[in-house]
Amino acid sequence: MRYSPSDLFHLLRTPVGRSQLKEGLQHRAWPVYSRLAGRHRRALRGHTRIVAVVGSYGKSTTARTVACTLGADTNRVSARNSWSHVAKALLAVRPQDPYGVLEVGIDGPGQMAEYARLVQPDLVVVTSIGTEHHRSLIDLEQTQSEKAEMVRVLDANCLAILNGDDPNVAWMADQTRA
């Protein structure tokens, strides 16, 4: 995404334009941040457990509750939960932390699989699956499949906590080895 100097000037003059520029930069920074975060995640293996909170609704509250329960720093749980923000949140987890809690959201198809490969969670919490993503995903089934990518990467020694009250989440029990 390239802008002429006059486009930049006009975008910088409005809050919406500044937000648009910032999001564009976050998206473009993803390749760099994701490589750094991937190396960092490998360094965390063995002494820091990573918890990923996914779902259409309730991620922020759930992530903060999980962090508080585990004694993790709730100030490092970011509600900004896509693209570079996921990588930055992973980079914020310190090697001496026993747990890191990440809120992971998506804006479109294919993203959750990328995040799952990057985050390599030890525990996944799936809150709910709803129609919030219909602007970027075709239907509820595509949303379910996309969100399930995070539980599909779990090994047998990992844990998936699924909302059994939501049939759109409960079916994921068959999608994981955990």
Predicted regions: what they are:
Residues 4-164, 168-177:
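Phosphate-binding loop of NTP-binding sites
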